[in-house]
Regions:
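Cysteine-dependent hydrolase recognition
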Residues: 19-522
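Bacterial Sec-dependent N-terminal signal peptides
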Residues: 1-20
């Protein structure tokens, strides 16, 4: 039975004289969650913040609401540790508004792909913005300095005596408004929180409408990989494959340009999960590549665009006519070939062609696009760069649509890997944050409400048991017999994590050898 407890708010003086308000849970639940925000964001979104808190509590999580005048990440981490000590069943947290950003150095071995010489390149480029600083309490960091330009950014070093692998204590997410979107950021945050709170009233929405898209050059353009992904998807999303058009599996080769078809799909109000498998940057997604040149005219257009852009990219450093003449000699083309070099109509058409191959944040803002999939995955490089003033993932949650949570990366990310590992847990009522915690990387983050979950295929208590039965080997052994692949995978993972003496290796090996599920054997 839910037991009412006294509403309590108190002030804590933290290092640097930050005044922190902690509003404790109004209900008692088996596990807990923390909302962490800055004082100004709280003051401007108070009603919406409390609506969200109440909705999360009604969804089964005792919820703390913490605001402070944060001067550095250590102050935030101190209150997280204090809350965790008070409530060991704390399973996750969300950072809303202007919560300081930790950029970590000496930890590139914890990324999937990011490798940059920290001595040769600027600090803001060679460090990794990561919230593992907040959610992995096992790691040890040494403060270096505050950024001289962006005072919300702080550099830390992962110490040599720290654990050298990720093992997050709890899940986390950011609700960070992209400043370049302009407008009233507090009104936008409040609107999002109300949307997230209202969505929790729907207790029956199962994960049965899924869309997957592979962009140009993803997984080396391998069509066999693209087709074989469906074997895993059938195990991840059984409800989607049980209904007509419940699952769509697109590839960039199907249309050029593809972006406008994707815009239509993104506006479908029945869509639950949208997965972008593509290359990217902070403010862009690579959707199409150049069309295959099947005739002379297409080859000529592509060559013309390539050489024209090569010349113009060096203008300013050298004289344009000199560059043109050198290019003519190098590529064995005549002067007539460059007749459109100063033609505005050529450059307009070239720019439109280039723009059609990408989705950029300007597209989303100009079109006022309302995205409706409840959850969107971006397994591209940089799409989750919340430390920038604009980033793709932020644009997808801050609009008038129904999107509640996005997954993205702050740095470049390895793509020839199992990007959909454990994603089928979402079909079984596991929260988005719990799923993301299981596949943690230094650069990987969630944006929006990490407590979001779909209704499970069958009633279960997995979302609670992941925390309260974490080290209960008997409980997880029993789930090895689940009829669902991802539940078995979770059981194997939890057993492996709890098996510090490596006593269960024969059992896990037997399961691997005998399972009929593709994803179990992965």
């Amino acid at each position: 039975m839910i037991k009412k407890i006294i509403y309590l708010a108190f002030l804590l003086p933290l290092a640097g004289n930050a005044q922190t308000t902690v509003i404790k849970p109004l209900v008692k639940q088996p596990t807990a969650f923390a909302i962490i925000t800055d004082n100004q964001t709280y003051a401007n979104t108070k009603d919406a913040m409390h609506q969200y808190k109440t909705a999360v509590e009604d969804d089964g999580l005792a919820t703390y609401l913490i605001s402070g005048d944060w001067q550095n990440p250590d102050q935030v981490k101190q209150i997280i540790i204090k809350t965790y000590q008070e409530c060991p069943s704390l399973e996750g947290l969300v950072l809303i508004g202007d919560v300081p950003v930790a950029l970590v150095r000496n930890a590139q071995h914890m990324t999937t792909a990011f490798k940059m010489n920290e001595k040769a390149f600027p600090w803001d480029q060679s460090s990794v913005p990561t919230d593992r600083f907040y959610d992995d309490l096992n790691l040890k960091f040494e403060f270096i300095r505050q950024d001289s330009v962006n005072h919300q950014h702080f550099y830390y070093k992962l110490t040599e005596d720290s654990p050298q692998r990720l093992n997050p204590t709890f899940y986390s997410a950011r609700i960070k408004y992209p400043e370049k979107k302009e407008g009233d950021k507090y009104a936008a945050i409040a609107s999002y929180l109300k949307k997230a709170a209202a969505a929790k009233a729907d207790k029956h929405n199962q994960l049965d409408r899924v869309f997957s898209f592979n962009g140009a050059s993803y997984n080396s353009d391998c069509l066999i990989v693209w087709m074989d992904d469906e074997k895993a998807y059938m195990e991840n999303f059984p409800l989607a494959f049980g209904r007509q058009m419940g699952f769509k599996h697109w590839n960039f080769r199907m249309k050029h340009p593809m972006k406008y078809k994707l815009f239509s799909e993104l506006q479908r109000k029945d869509l639950d999960l949208f997965m972008f498998h593509e290359h990217g940057m902070p403010t862009g997604q690579l959707i199409n590549d150049e069309l295959a040149c099947t005739d002379f005219n297409n080859r000529y257009k592509m060559l013309k665009s390539t050489l024209y852009n090569a010349v113009m990219s060096h203008v300013g450093k050298r004289d344009k006519d000199t560059l043109r003449i050198q290019m003519q000699e190098k590529r064995q083309v005549n002067e007539v070939f460059f007749k459109d070099l100063d033609n505005p109509k050529f450059w307009e058409a070239d720019s439109l062609h280039y723009a059609d191959e990408r989705i950029v944040t300007e597209d989303l803002m100009k079109r006022n696009l309302s995205t409706n999939p409840k959850m969107i995955m971006f397994d591209a490089c940089y799409n989750g760069s919340f430390h920038e003033n604009d980033y793709i993932a932020g644009q997808y949650i801050f609009n008038d649509g129904q999107t509640l949570v996005a997954q993205g990366n702050t740095r470049n990310v390895l793509q020839d890997r199992w990007t959909i590992e454990m994603i089928g847990l979402l079909s079984h009522g596991v929260r988005a944050g719990q799923y993301n915690k299981l596949i943690a990387s230094l650069e990987g983050h969630l944006f929006g409400d990490p407590t979001f979950r779909f209704a499970p295929i069958e009633a279960n208590t997995l979302s609670t048991d992941i925390t309260i039965h974490k080290d209960d080997k008997a409980y997880w052994k029993n789930l090895l017999n689940s009829p669902y692949a991802d539940v078995q995978s979770l059981a194997m993972r939890m057993l492996a994590d709890a098996d510090t003496q490596k006593e269960l290796s024969p059992l896990l090996l037997k399961k691997y050898r005998e399972s009929g599920f593709n994803t179990i054997r992965m």
